[in-house]
Each structure stands twice: as C-alpha cells, then as structure tokens.
Amino acid sequence: MSNNTTAVTGTASADPFDDPVTSNKMAIRALIPLLITFVLGTLCLQGFNLVFQQVGAAVGAPHQASLITAFPSIVLGIVCFIYGSLGDFVSLRKLVTVGLVTLFVGSIFGFVANYFFAANLWTVIIARVLQTAGEQVAGSAFLVVATKYLRNDLKVIFFGLFTAAYQLSASIGVFAAGMLSSIAWQFLFLIPSVTILFLPILLKTLPSKSGNGQKVDAFGFVIFGFATAFLTLFFSYMAWWMLVVSLLLFVAFAFYINKASNPFITPAFFKNTRWLRAICLILVFYFVNYALSPIFNAIGTNIYGMTTTQVSLHIVWAFVVAAVVGTCSGMIIRKIGIKAGIVTAGTLMFLGWTGAAFCVNSGFVVLTLCACVFYAGCGLMYSPVVSTVLGTIEKDESGRGVGMNDLAMNVSPSIGIAIIGSLLGSNALAGGSITGVTGTAANYANLLLVAAGTALLGLIVFFVFKKKIYEGNHALETEESAK
C-alpha cells in the first residue's frame, strides 16, 4: 500500500518538462498563447508609433509627443535583455504572470484615465511603459521556451512563426491605428488587454521550476539595466554624455562580473569565441534593418511628391511578404539547411537594397518590389541566425543567450538608423552615384548602396567564420534529425 502510494505521488509530482516527449507537447501549448500575446502587444506598440503626434496634440503637448514613443523604447531596450536572462533563474510561470498582469493593468489604466477623464501626457506615457514592460515578457518567454523545451526540428519553425508574427503585427498596426484614431485613439490601449484570458492556460503549460536554483543577481541586473538604458537614450537623443555614462557602467559591469561570487552572467560567457563570432552575424545583418522605411519615405516625399500615408500603403506590402516568408521559413530551413538559409536570406537582403539603389527614379512600385525582396530576406533570416547563435551556448544559458540576441537586435539597428538618419538629412552623399543619378536622388541611391554593402559584409563575415561557428553547434542537430 505504501509503495503504491509512493508510486502514485511520484507520478503526480513528476515535472512534464523533465521528459523530452511531454515537454515538447507542453511547450507547444504554451507557445501559441505567448505568440498571440506578443502579436497584440506589438500591434499596440506599432499603432502608437504611428499616431503619437496626434495623441500629443490631443493631450495638449504636441512638442513633447515624441516622449510617448521614447520612454517605452527605453523600457523595451532594458527589459528585452533582462527578461530573457531571468528565464535562467526565475520560474517562467511567475515571470509571465507578472508580465500579463502588468500588461492588463497598463491597458485598463491607459484607457480609463484618458477616455473617462481628461487625457494627460503622463498618464499616456505611464500606461505605455506598463504595457511595453508587460508585453515583452511574452516575447522573451516564447524564445526561452522554444530554445529549452522544443524538439530541435521544431525550433526553426517556431522561430519563423515568431518573426512572421512580428512583421504581421507591424503591418496590421498601421491599419488598426488609422481606423481607431478616427474613432478614439484611447481604444488602442485595449487591444492587448484580452491577453489576460490566456493566464489560466499558461499557468498550466509553463514550467514552474526556478531555473538553475541560484539566487537572482539583482545588483548585476541593475548595473546592466542602467547601462542599456543610457545606451538606448543616446540613440534617441544623440547626447554624447549619455554614451559616456553607458560605457562607464559597462566597464563597471565587466569589473563586477569578474569579482562577484555568483553574477547572473560570467566572464566565461563572453569568452565563448563561437558565440562571439555568431553574434557578429546579428550585429552586421541587422545593422540597417530600421533604415528602409525612412529612406523610402524621403524618396516618396521628395522625388515622387507622395504623402507619408501613401508611402506607408506601399511599404506595408513588404511587411506582408516578410510575414509570409517568416511563416514558411521553418519549412524552408528544414529543406535547405541552416547554412544555406542564412546565405539565401543575406543574398535577398543584398539584392533588395542594390535593386532599390539602381531604381530610385524607376517608379515607386518598382521600389516597393525591391522592398519586398529585402523583407523576404529579413523574414527568412531570423530563424536560422537565431538558431545558429543559440546553438553555440549550453541550454542552461539559453535565457541569457535570448537576452543577448534581443539586445543585439535592438542596439545594432539603432546605431545604424542614427548614422543613416544623419546622412539622410544632410545630403552628404548627393555629389553623384555609380547608379547614374544625381542630386538628391544620388544621396538616396548611395545610402541604399551603403545598406547593400552591409548585407554583403554580413555574407562575408558568415563565410569567414562559418567553420568555427558550427563546430559542435547544437543547431546542426536540427538538420541531422531531419535527415
């Protein structure tokens, strides 16, 4: 009797995430609601990015309207790393619970405070900060769960769905913001509020164990968080003292992790040369990812006499292409392999930029087709490059790996857009171009060629580092298991 009771108790208390078969099923059940939450949160983010000037005017602060997007961007820059890293130490169940509740509170507070009471700039900002901090939990948890608990051959599929979801929500956000702003912009706050209904499902399907059992290194997270915050602020305001403060904090962080007994990330993590080479792929390939929209907007406005709305209605099709390719990227990578996937994606990005550079005066429809080629490359790139980078580290470090990936994907294009943006406004490259155009068109063509050169550099980096990156890389297990 006693033995039977013990057996029953042992079975009942067994963690399904300890068994590869059951963990895979549980992970899939958790990933779907996490993905929907991420989509709705990103949709809200993109919507406010489109109408923030209208919101600023509505709350009586048109000259401070940029703060509506600036503060959430700063928060996003901090939490994208911290949430992923916390996945190695804190129960994902607890982390997601806090995130969904924060997202819900921000949504309801933002709507009630600005719809039923006098709209105020700071209630909008506070609500958007809460929403951003909450929704990013879903994105980070999705990547951690997919990395730690999914079968290798399914990882590329769900990574592809993740990037597809982001691109799709970005395109839908444009239309949602336009539609809701004509009714009342306050309703944008309510879009992600329904995700609180997923909490009961996620409480049953997410792992409850607390990572590796170590205490959370709060001091280390604070130093790194402030360093990241000042770095993000620098790219928002281009104030050099912010960059100096950020660098000093990163130096202090490096000193701290070398001296602390249990830092959340050790110096050994950064001494992993395979990871360092792999993360270079993200830093280079994603460097100009934010540049296409402003360059195309400038071309449409100054060369074709289009409005920003007309330009966005063209570019949105490129986002749709990225979403479709991203959805299919898992199947594509399973067919052609991770290495060929990165080469194909990088080539599409290069061809998209180069084609646009040579077609500046060929009509905006032609430019839109070039944008579709570029974004097809973006949609295909995410799955194999993330699999490659995370394949260079151990699974018990995957949360920190996800955090570093997110940080690289946010910081690298922020640097890129700061450089491209300054050149875009100064017409510094308007002297002439190998594409044959002159004047303002030459400036745009040369900027597009610079972006094409970045994609080409990414391919060169890949071929130079390929052998070292894939020595013992876990990502290659995907190809081997699929054969």
Regions found by a protein language model. Give the residues of each.
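Glycine/proline-centered helix-kink
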Residues: 49, 140-143, 161, 166-179, ...
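12-transmembrane solute porter fold
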Residues: 28-44, 49, 69-71, 106, ...
